């Protein structure tokens, strides 16, 4: 689980927390009006005519076919991604988010077999989510519209997941409303924000989820998107009033479906206290995979990743098979 890690970061990517301390971090206090705006946003997103369009087949990979896909999200934003359909029977659906770098292709193989899967690109991000007026680099994207709750870009990114789910269900109606969600880093945090309000999702896996416990994150230097937010907050401390409404740990306390979280003890990009705050806040059935490192690529992390994928497959298969 833990191992000595040599590094040259100008800060300690454990932030002084061991596993016991990480498991004791609660979610921050929620704003009194946290729930209603999310519920209203979800209602609006579910009313969107997503008008999904499937392009030509782009690849054939180990028993699955890959197609380009486009759909409309909240506020008329047209987004792209990939639709992956397995050969043979299809009995479940997956929505798979991405990290803050966006994505250039779907992540294959799929986490579970027999799953029709949509890989959406969030608004503003590479390569099929670019939107005029929204920066596509991480440092500026995470600050876009941060001055107000209704204008913050993460609000739209959450709606993009809901609309992607609608698109998938329209394209493959046989799977019914029994979806799984998988997301890492940015996708883990956005997933945590999306899951409490949408009963079409029945199980989820979140790896090193971002946006957890903003009051703590704002005290911790990092190499990820949180650093831009931390520096912005130093000059504009009032932004905490917006960030409290986009706290993945606060949202996680409202999730009731089974969720597996993979959280790291050492992570220079997403501070581990925020990751564990998301897991600790979960009230439904939950499973924890403790990673030695997050956002680190070395020989040990490659092996650890294979162990994680096996755990993810077992968890999702078990819980999606119940529906």
Where do the protein language model's features map onto the residues?
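Gly/Ser-rich "nucleophile elbow"/oxyanion-hole loop immediately N-terminal to the catalytic nucleophile
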Residues: 142-185
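N-terminal targeting or regulatory segments adjacent to alpha/beta-hydrolase or S9 domains
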Residues: 1-63
């Amino acid at each position: 689980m833990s191992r000595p890690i040599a590094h040259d970061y100008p800060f300690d990517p454990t932030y002084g927390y061991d596993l016991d301390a990480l498991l004791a971090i609660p979610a921050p206090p929620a704003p009194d009006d946290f729930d209603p705006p999310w519920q209203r946003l979800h209602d609006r997103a579910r009313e969107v005519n997503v008008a999904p369009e499937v392009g030509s087949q782009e690849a054939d990979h180990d028993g699955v076919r890959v197609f380009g896909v486009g759909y409309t999200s909240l506020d008329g934003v047209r987004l792209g991604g990939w639709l992956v359909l397995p050969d043979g029977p299809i009995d479940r659906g997956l929505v798979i988010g991405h990290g803050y770098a966006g994505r250039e292709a779907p992540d294959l193989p799929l986490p579970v077999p027999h799953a029709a899967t949509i890989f959406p690109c969030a608004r503003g991000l590479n390569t099929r989510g670019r939107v005029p007026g929204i920066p596509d680099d991480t440092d500026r994207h995470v600050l876009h519209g941060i001055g107000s709750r209704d204008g913050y870009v993460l609000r739209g990114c959450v709606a993009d997941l809901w609309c992607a789910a609608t698109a998938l269900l329209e394209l493959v109606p046989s799977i019914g409303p029994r979806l799984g969600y998988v997301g890492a880093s940015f996708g883990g945090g956005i997933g945590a924000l999306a899951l409490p309000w949408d009963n079409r999702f029945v199980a989820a896996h979140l790896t090193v989820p971002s946006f957890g416990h903003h009051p703590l994150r704002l005290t911790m230097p990092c190499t990820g998107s949180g650093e831009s937010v931390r520096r912005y907050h130093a000059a504009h401390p009032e932004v905490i009033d917006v960030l409290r409404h986009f706290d993945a740990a606060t949202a996680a306390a409202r999730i009731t479906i089974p969720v597996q979280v993979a959280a790291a003890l050492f992570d220079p990009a997403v501070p581990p206290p925020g990751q564990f705050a998301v897991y600790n806040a979960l009230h439904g059935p939950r499973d924890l995979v403790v990673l030695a490192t997050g956002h680190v690529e070395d020989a040990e992390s490659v092996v650890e990743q294979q162990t994680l994928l096996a755990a993810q497959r077992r968890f999702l298969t078990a819980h999606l098979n119940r529906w």
